[in-house]
Amino acid sequence: MDVADLPGVPEWLPDHLRDDGIEELYPPQAEAVEAGVTEGENLVASIPTASGKTLIAELAMLSSVARGGKALYIVPLRALASEKQADFEEFEQYGLDIGVSTGNYESEGGWLADKDIVVATSEKVDSLVRNDAPWIEDLTCVVTDEVHLVDDGERGPTLEVTLAKLRRLNPDLQTVALSATIGNAEALATWLDAGLVDSDWRPIDLQKGVHYGQALHLEDGSQQRLSVQNNEKQTAAIVRDTLEDDGSTLVFVNSRRNAEAAAGRLANTVRPHLSTEERDQLADIAEEIRDVSDTETSDDLADAVADGAAFHHAGLSRGHRELVEDAFRDRLVKVVCATPTLAAGVNTPSRRVVVRDWRRYDGSAGGMAPLSVLEVHQMMGRAGRPGLDPYGEAVLIASSHDEVDELFERYVWADPEPVRSKLAAEPALRTHILATVASGFARSRKGLLEFLEQTLYASQTDDSGQLERVVDDVLTYLQRNDFLEIEAGELDATSLGHTVSRLYLDPMSAAEIVDGLRDWERGASDSTSASGSPADAQAEPPANSGFTTASELAEDADESDADRDPDDISALGLYHLVSRTPDMYQLYLRSGDREEYEMELFEREEELLGPTPSEFEEGRFEDWLSALKTARLLEDWATEVDEATITDRYGVGPGDIRGKVETAQWLLGAAESLASEVDLDAARAISEARIRVEHGVREELVDLAGVRGVGRKRARRLFQAGITDRAQLRDADKAVVLAALRGRRKTAENVLENAGHRDPSMEGVEPAPDVSVDLNDGADGDASAESTANDDQASLGDF
């Protein structure tokens, strides 16, 4: 189909597409147009990577906006939101306004009301619906990317419920769902009342195969000689062979440690193939990487990149990941060793893809388990860059003849698995049932079940009784913890329930926080956790359990004569409290950690909020220690321990630190609101702990670190130079500020301007010679420097 023949699109679009080199649509795109995607029809497009899904989305959204509507593009990851924002901003030259929102789950996003196209994560859209964002009802088109992720146990239920709510709010809403090739695309189309484009067409050929011995065995039965030289690993041989043909390679491995180790080894393979110009450019990129953060991870990445290799995983900071992705797309970095996060939609294709590890550790299986066909096919789909490569090759690694046959049967010739809803799990339903009632989507048990009948889960199961049983268990839990009132089948969210829904908390997290704060304030030694499972909540609590609902607590708060001073709550106690909630991904206990944190617990147990589980409660006690380890990381961050020490001490990457800090910041903010809701006097202590962990500083630096552009390291330098708060910075001697900031004029000007200095210009100013600061970290890689206006809250699960 010629772009001139597109129906229903803005008149400027055909010329715009031609300017981008697009004269005719790909076959799947033409099928989508024939199915009515530019005329408001619902559509599911299940097609391979790089087959034109983004243009299908753009056709749907732009035609909807041309009819006077408003479009929403839902992405699974924050990184994808930034990428799509950059893509769609091309349309601003034609008068369209693009907005992106991925954080601040308490906001209704009023500023998005005037945007023509909004890009957001599914969690953000869910929170907008909960907070009654009025512009949601103005939507005429919603596109959801990677819709096959409804199969994901953690994020899938949110996407599923959010789509169901949007379709109920806007009965005429056009829904376009983009998916990888899956085994049951027709089931998604049926659920969404949509037409279906189900195609395996690709713009360039993809050859799949298995490497073993001295040959690459391809799916058509042919063999290609690919020799392994003396002492050379198979992966290195494949990378070398690709380099000799001027190609790039993506290597997928099963852990962060393996990604880093493989990149270090493959750098030796790449180095001899680099030109002098490439070496110089890579050296500059390596220095940029070192500037992002002063950590061992940053140094290891910079060393690899200098030699044309890189690793990529969720433990890297956003700055690291963007530098790696850009260098790979620019063909400077020749090989990237990645965990499967890179296969989740970020646009980084390569000539060859090597799936080195097809098993990974699975705690539920008690050991190593094979990857799904869908995951492996997603990785393989990254092979081949349209317009750059004549073909793409995807290679699995076999260690024996038998394994060659197994890999062909398991992955090369196999069809992807069907996607299945994960909504019926109790943790997912806890959150979404409360939100559904609090936002008015259901006001009775019957209405709740009717709403859930609109989900994918309901369309995939014949056992409605199972859903009813789980729903009733969850309703009992929510009632027992004072989140819902239930009378004669009618459901009403309590004030606390509304607050929890607005804060985007798992109700179990809220129960844990309220109970922990209550335990501290009342000084009770016999209280029990309010975070038992819904099944446990069916039984009446024992008479001596100390269980008190939040409403009862509010009535009793003034009557207790055994209260502790709420200002005595330690930061560690609060960090531990939020670290043991379901909304925080705890650090694992490594070998040898248990003894260390048992000793830590013995020494600091009095600071913790709530009763410590018995050592005989193996699972709960282990979780308690894991939460303590996580809390200690947060405490280190808030007491200005440098990032390099934290990454080494806890075995994490810079991105992990940022993730834990942002999640703790959000949960502590929620704890402040909960404390006020149930009349607990801990808000001031919680606020201080939140601000300190937000900026990563001790108490005396809180005011300084709050100045935009300062951050933890610069705040300490300014403090040591005698500038102790924002007011002093506003009136400070510019020479002293310049010296404290190590002569960086632009940085000093920005800091002074943000502090409100009457004349922030550094023209003609020299650093004061008598100012010295006792910091030898060598980098200004404050975590805060990585944030932008759009990064006010981390999207949970991205880390």
Curated annotation (Swiss-Prot):
<keyword id="KW-0413">Isomerase</keyword>
<feature type="region of interest" description="Disordered">
    <location>
        <begin position="522"/>
        <end position="566"/>
    </location>
</feature>
<dbReference type="InterPro" id="IPR050474">
    <property type="entry name" value="Hel308_SKI2-like"/>
</dbReference>
<dbReference type="InterPro" id="IPR011545">
    <property type="entry name" value="DEAD/DEAH_box_helicase_dom"/>
</dbReference>
<keyword id="KW-0234">DNA repair</keyword>
<dbReference type="InterPro" id="IPR048772">
    <property type="entry name" value="Hel308-like_dom4"/>
</dbReference>
<protein>
    <recommendedName>
        <fullName>ATP-dependent DNA helicase Hel308</fullName>
        <ecNumber>5.6.2.4</ecNumber>
    </recommendedName>
</protein>
<keyword id="KW-0378">Hydrolase</keyword>
<feature type="domain" description="Helicase ATP-binding">
    <location>
        <begin position="34"/>
        <end position="200"/>
    </location>
</feature>
<dbReference type="InterPro" id="IPR036390">
    <property type="entry name" value="WH_DNA-bd_sf"/>
</dbReference>
<feature type="short sequence motif" description="DEAH box">
    <location>
        <begin position="145"/>
        <end position="148"/>
    </location>
</feature>
<feature type="region of interest" description="Disordered">
    <location>
        <begin position="750"/>
        <end position="799"/>
    </location>
</feature>
<feature type="binding site">
    <location>
        <begin position="47"/>
        <end position="54"/>
    </location>
    <ligand>
        <name>ATP</name>
    </ligand>
</feature>
<dbReference type="GO" id="GO:0006281">
    <property type="term" value="P:DNA repair"/>
</dbReference>
<comment type="subunit">
    <text>Monomer.</text>
</comment>
<comment type="function">
    <text>DNA-dependent ATPase and 3'-5' DNA helicase that may be involved in repair of stalled replication forks.</text>
</comment>
<dbReference type="GO" id="GO:0016887">
    <property type="term" value="F:ATP hydrolysis activity"/>
</dbReference>
<dbReference type="InterPro" id="IPR001650">
    <property type="entry name" value="Helicase_C-like"/>
</dbReference>
<comment type="similarity">
    <text>Belongs to the helicase family. Hel308 subfamily.</text>
</comment>
<dbReference type="Pfam" id="PF00271">
    <property type="entry name" value="Helicase_C"/>
</dbReference>
<dbReference type="Pfam" id="PF21280">
    <property type="entry name" value="Helicase_dom4_arc"/>
</dbReference>
<feature type="compositionally biased region" description="Acidic residues">
    <location>
        <begin position="553"/>
        <end position="566"/>
    </location>
</feature>
<feature type="domain" description="Helicase C-terminal">
    <location>
        <begin position="234"/>
        <end position="435"/>
    </location>
</feature>
<dbReference type="Pfam" id="PF00270">
    <property type="entry name" value="DEAD"/>
</dbReference>
<keyword id="KW-0067">ATP-binding</keyword>
<dbReference type="InterPro" id="IPR022965">
    <property type="entry name" value="Helicase_Hel308"/>
</dbReference>
<dbReference type="InterPro" id="IPR014001">
    <property type="entry name" value="Helicase_ATP-bd"/>
</dbReference>
<keyword id="KW-0238">DNA-binding</keyword>
<keyword id="KW-0547">Nucleotide-binding</keyword>
<dbReference type="GO" id="GO:0043138">
    <property type="term" value="F:3'-5' DNA helicase activity"/>
</dbReference>
<dbReference type="GO" id="GO:0005524">
    <property type="term" value="F:ATP binding"/>
</dbReference>
<dbReference type="InterPro" id="IPR027417">
    <property type="entry name" value="P-loop_NTPase"/>
</dbReference>
<dbReference type="GO" id="GO:0003677">
    <property type="term" value="F:DNA binding"/>
</dbReference>
<keyword id="KW-0227">DNA damage</keyword>
<dbReference type="InterPro" id="IPR046931">
    <property type="entry name" value="HTH_61"/>
</dbReference>
<dbReference type="Pfam" id="PF20470">
    <property type="entry name" value="HTH_61"/>
</dbReference>
<keyword id="KW-0347">Helicase</keyword>
<feature type="binding site">
    <location>
        <position position="29"/>
    </location>
    <ligand>
        <name>ATP</name>
    </ligand>
</feature>
